[in-house]
């Protein structure tokens, strides 16, 4: 069964690119035509590239890897957080802090500080302090939660990153490339395909399009988790030595995917068809 259908892509508005005066010539091969001054993306190619990206993500997770979901623009924030949380992956949907990948040791110290402050609050560590001190500590904790909450359990740099809007997230993409971390991303008509390892030509401005493609990547992660556990029939098994004990969230995911499974080997169902929205032209940023 197809990972996603042409109708789903059309309904989400994934075929709408930017205005013809705002494009990257390197994207020419992904453009089908232009309509009323708007480029139309070739969705047949999109389907092909989705399959390639899906397979890569599934195999990466099956062999113990993690995928960092990145999307800080308003249109992507909700779906990035929801889908990453659904499959237990780290995410950044507020502000990307410079060095989040290339200087992860420092970022990890800030994560430890966040957990320290949360523990203080929960165990009464704020008691006996002045109102001003409590206010300062609370503000610090809230700020850390807002910027780092999505990666609080990330112990090392990810195996790959999923990006919505490579232009807006150019710092994240640049850091990933410095560390040779594969980049999977939506490629709108104003993006540079040379910066992405696994491109998916599509609309990165429409909420429905970003949500649909993020859901596809999350579904690939979910299938990779099942393959890692050896439950997905016909999928390649993890290499010897890669089979770490499943995390609690992974066990819950497997239980949800196989509610009647006592040795069941059924693959996870394909992503549910989304409600068909009216086609819309994305805002030109």
Curated annotation (Swiss-Prot):
Keyword Cell membrane included in the entry's annotation: no
InterPro entries named in the record: Ribosomal_uS2, Ribosomal_uS2_bac/mit/plastid, Ribosomal_uS2_CS, Ribosomal_uS2_flav_dom_sf
Gene Ontology biological process terms in this record: translation
Region (Disordered): 229-285
Gene Ontology MF term list: structural constituent of ribosome
Superkingdom as given in the UniProt entry: Bacteria
Translocase recorded as keyword: no
Protein name: Small ribosomal subunit protein uS2
UniProt keyword terms in alphabetical order: Ribonucleoprotein, Ribosomal protein
Signal peptide location: none
Pfam family, one: Ribosomal_S2
Family assignment from sequence similarity: Belongs to the universal ribosomal protein uS2 family.
PROSITE patterns on file: RIBOSOMAL_S2_1
Species annotation: Nocardia farcinica (strain IFM 10152)
Extent of Low complexity compositional bias: 257-285
Gene behind the chain: rpsB
Gene Ontology cellular component list: cytosolic small ribosomal subunit
């Amino acid at each position: 069964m197809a990972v996603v259908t042409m109708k789903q892509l059309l309904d989400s508005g994934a075929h709408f690119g930017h205005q013809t005066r705002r494009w990257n010539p390197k994207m020419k091969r992904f453009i089908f035509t232009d309509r009323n001054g708007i480029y139309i993306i070739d969705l047949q190619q999109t389907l092909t590239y989705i399959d390639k990206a899906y397979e890569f993500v599934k195999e990466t997770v099956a062999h113990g890897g993690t995928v960092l979901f990145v999307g800080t623009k308003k249109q992507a924030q909700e779906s990035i957080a929801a889908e990453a949380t659904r499959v237990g992956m780290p995410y950044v949907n507020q502000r990307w802090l410079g060095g989040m990948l290339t200087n992860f040791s420092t970022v990890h110290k800030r994560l430890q500080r966040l957990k320290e402050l949360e523990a203080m609050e929960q165990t009464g560590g704020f008691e006996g302090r002045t109102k001003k001190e409590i206010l300062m500590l609370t503000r610090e904790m809230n700020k850390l939660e807002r910027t780092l909450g999505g990666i609080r359990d990330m112990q090392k740099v990810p195996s790959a990153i999923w990006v919505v809007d490579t232009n807006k997230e150019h710092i994240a993409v640049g850091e990933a490339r410095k560390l040779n971390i594969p980049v999977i991303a939506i490629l709108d008509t104003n993006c540079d395909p040379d910066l992405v390892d696994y491109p998916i030509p599509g609309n990165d401005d429409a909420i429905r399009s970003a949500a649909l493609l993020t859901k596809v990547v999350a579904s690939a992660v979910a299938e990779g988790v099942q393959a890692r556990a050896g439950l997905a029939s016909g999928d390649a098994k993890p290499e010897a030595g890669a089979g770490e004990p499943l995390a609690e969230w992974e066990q819950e995911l497997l239980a949800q995917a196989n509610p009647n499974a006592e040795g069941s080997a059924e693959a996870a169902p394909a992503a549910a068809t989304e409600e068909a929205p009216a086609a819309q032209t994305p805002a030109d940023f």
